[in-house]
Amino acid sequence: MVQERHPQRKGVCWTLRLWSTAVISMLLLSTCFIASCMVTYQFTMEKPNRRLSELHTYHSSLTCCSKGTMVSEKLWGCCPNHWKSFGSSCYLISTKENFWSISEQNYIHMGAHLVVINTETEQNYIIHQLNESLSYFLGLSDPQGNSKWQWIDNTPYPNNIKFWHPHEPNLPEEWCASIVYWNPSKWGWNDVFCDSKHNSICETKKIYL
């Protein structure tokens, strides 16, 4: 009878070891999963939080608008207070005239840049915010004066949409672009001297929360 008990003990001990190993494995997997989620969450939130911190450095308050209908679907897009919100960007229309380079430097210090127009819809939105008696610098220039225009954010110019007035750009000495209202063609782009003073349009990306 004693000899018959040994196989049973071996079987029980093996079963317990297997169960213990399974429990330990599950705990390790759970720990790894939680750690992975924490890393993913931190990675996902780090960039928006950094961007939010940057905006707060330049602006005392933000205006956020929600998207989605259910609480779980809501996504908040934030712009500096008093800026115009459209698509994934925020816009500020300047009330002061300045040189192209100074306007761009001022906007860089605000965490933004002169506007880059990528679509007709964006252009149409912007022109509804403008004064027809004024001219506004864009983030578009020809730094070498060799007809190689480039956007301030390195958006490829040749493949991008263009809204030049007829016969513009027309002078190699005019290295900067503005948007201006002319009859009968209405709003369009014009090349101007960079050291002439114009109003300007500022753009920055929304921060999503």
Swiss-Prot record:
Q: Which residues form the C-type lectin domain?
A: 86-203
Query: Which chain regions cross the lipid bilayer?
Result: 21-43
Annotated protein name in UniProt = C-type lectin domain family 6 member A
Give the GO molecular function terms: calcium ion binding; carbohydrate binding; D-mannose binding; pattern recognition receptor activity
Query: What species does this protein belong to?
Result: Rattus norvegicus
Q: What is the lineage of its organism?
A: Eukaryota, Metazoa, Chordata, Craniata, Vertebrata
Query: Which positions are annotated as binding alpha-D-mannopyranose?
Result: 168-170, 174, 182, 190-191
* Sites where the protein binds Ca(2+) 2: 168, 170, 174, 190-191
Q: How does this chain assemble?
A: Associated with FCER1G. Heterodimer with CLEC4D; this heterodimer forms a pattern recognition receptor (PRR) against fungal infection.
Gene Ontology biological process terms from the UniProt entry? adaptive immune response; antifungal innate immune response; defense response to fungus; innate immune response; positive regulation of canonical NF-kappaB signal transduction; positive regulation of cytokine production; positive regulation of T-helper 17 type immune response
